[in-house]
Design a protein with these regions (language model features):
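N-terminal secretory signal peptides that target proteins for export/translocation
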Residues: 1-13
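Intrinsically disordered low-complexity regions specifically enriched for long asparagine
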Residues: 5-8, 27, 36
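Hydrophobic residues within membrane-embedded alpha helices
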Residues: 9, 17-19, 373
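Patatin-like phospholipase
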Residues: 32-120, 136-409
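Catalytic nucleophile serine of serine hydrolases
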Residues: 125-126
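Hydrolases whose catalytic domains are alpha/beta-hydrolase-1, hotdog thioesterase
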Residues: 131-134
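Bacterial N-terminal signal peptides
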Residues: 17-29
């Protein structure tokens, strides 16, 4: 490589540094304090459990049910009686940005195998929200799901507005393109299908993060669709938008709620920092049920090989590694739920040896098509892992007892 080439690389690195430094400097100057929220929920109310004014179901939190069963076992008491009812098929879809193309492929491949069940419960986090949404409504929406993620570019979802975002303190990108997509796809037919499924006792749950309280919010989408509210469709669109709104990057979504007769304002965003996969049901999980986990991405982050990451990359990698660890921990919790309820656990994740760009926000249609194909093949072939990632005996790494090791060749 000649001197001119080195010079170009030097200029490129300086330009890249300035590109990072200028927004950070602006953030320090004007973006450190966000806009005030008009009439937020008072702090004493945020720590108390809220109940719906019109109860929609006997909701069950999987974590609470698991702990109750394990607590009885630890105390030597008899386990709670097994709930009556037929086994359920529960679908849990994780977040993962562009990796949703993989889960879309897995669902469509599963349909092609003829073994895909009708989901009694579907849950979604982050980009898993729209995937779980369409999966819940059935194979009728497979083509829409595939087309949505196969040809997606980032500008179809978000567009940069860094200066305006930093001045207002709301976000570096606008989510207006995603709003238009949701307006197009969540129409009257979808609302009717949602209400019909809910009337059959099936449930769709989407998670968001309450930005002001840093707590998880779970939304019963079918209950909203069947509520008769004139703004029901708009609420559902806003919930999906909030689920996909990356905190700090995209503005949080505002909701006006009424608590004890008083109107307050909340801000909601992507819940991926609070949970990666979860289970909620409209009753206890009967024995023989199946919990199907679709991971929008790999089980472990890509490794940094052959180079030492810089400061910014190290910070990003640390956050990414934390989210991956949260995902793996959440799958262990779901596995424990299956153990205490005598249910089946199955997981499909993008293989760790898949070669692609590491950023989940870099949308490349060619890469999306490759991920979709891998997912399709795994879904069609029934490539379900029976245990959470990293928990099989062969995957367990013992503590280090020095600096000399032996590795498989």
């Amino acid at each position: 490589m000649g001197t001119g080439s080195r010079g170009r690389w030097g200029i490129a690195r300086i330009a890249h540094g300035l590109a990072l430094a200028v927004p950070l400097a602006l953030a320090a100057a004007v973006g450190c304090v966000g806009p005030k929220v008009r009439n937020p929920v008072p702090d004493p109310l945020t720590t108390k459990p809220w109940t719906n004014e019109k109860p929609a179901a006997d909701y069950h939190d999987a974590d609470a049910d698991t702990v109750a069963s394990l607590a009885a076992a630890v105390a030597g008491a008899n386990p709670p009686p097994a709930p009556a009812g037929r086994p359920l098929n529960v679908l849990c879809v994780s977040g993962g940005g562009k990796y949703a193309a993989f889960t879309a492929g897995a669902l469509c491949g599963w349909t092609s195998s003829g073994t895909r069940p009708e989901f009694d419960v579907a849950t979604g986090v982050s980009s898993g929200a729209p995937t779980a949404f369409m999966a819940f409504l059935g194979p009728k929406y497979d083509n829409s799901l595939a087309q949505l993620f196969l040809h997606l570019n980032r500008n179809d979802l978000f567009r940069w507005q860094p200066v305006r975002g930093l001045v207002t303190g709301r976000g570096l990108m606008t989510s207006r393109p995603l709003e238009k997509l949701l307006d197009k796809h969540i129409d009257d037919e979808v609302m009717a299908d949602l209400c019909a499924a809910h009337g059959q006792g099936r449930r769709l749950f989407i998670a968001t993060s309450n930005v002001l309280t840093h707590r998880l919010a779970i939304w019963d989408i079918g209950a909203i669709a069947c509520s008769g509210r004139p703004d029901g469709k708009e609420i559902i669109r806003k919930v999906v938008l909030a689920a996909c709104s990356i905190p700090g990057i995209v503005p949080a979504v505002e909701f006006d709620v009424v608590v004890n007769g008083v109107r307050y304002r909340e801000l909601h965003a992507d819940a991926g920092n609070l949970t990666q996969v979860f289970v909620r049901t409209a009753g206890p999980l009967p024995p023989g049920s199946s919990v199907w986990v679709l991971s929008a991405g790999k089980s472990y982050p890509n490794r940094s090989v052959g180079k030492c990451p810089g400061i910014f990359e190290t910070l990003v990698n640390a956050v990414s590694a934390t989210l991956y660890a949260l995902y793996r921990a959440d799958t262990v919790k779901l596995y424990a739920l299956c153990g205490t309820t005598k249910s089946r656990f199955g997981l499909i994740a993008l293989p760790d040896d898949f070669q692609g760009r590491s950023s989940s926000m870099v949308f490349d249609p060619a890469e999306s098509q490759r991920m979709y194909l891998v997912g399709y093949q795994m879904g069609a072939g029934g490539a379900w892992e029976p245990v959470p990632p990293g928990t099989a005996p062969a995957d367990v790494i013992p503590p280090r007892a020095g600096l000399e090791f032996t590795a498989p060749q």
